[in-house]
Amino acid sequence: KNYILDKNERILKKNNTFLKITEKEIDFIEILNSSTKPLSKDFILKNIWNYSTDTDTHTVETHIYRLRQKIKDKFKDSNFIKNSKKGYSL
């Protein structure tokens, strides 16, 4: 999608547009980008937040919503993070 992730500056870039992102958002983008298949909410909770999969939380959904909004507002891209029955992917 022509995005560049600068972890040191905590910036997501596309063309000449920059978006400041948090460490968790970087972790989230990296884990999704490293996978060839969609990742489940439980997998993301365990690997990014170290939460038990028994925990009832909306952490993943909340972070996805916020990151999608930031990317949509800045880059006009509403399909950066996709979700399906199998999980989330880039």
Model features per residue range: what roles?
Residues 2-27, 89-90:
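A structural micro-motif at secondary-structure boundaries
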Residues 16-85:
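Positively charged, aromatic-enriched patches within helix-turn-helix-type DNA-binding elements
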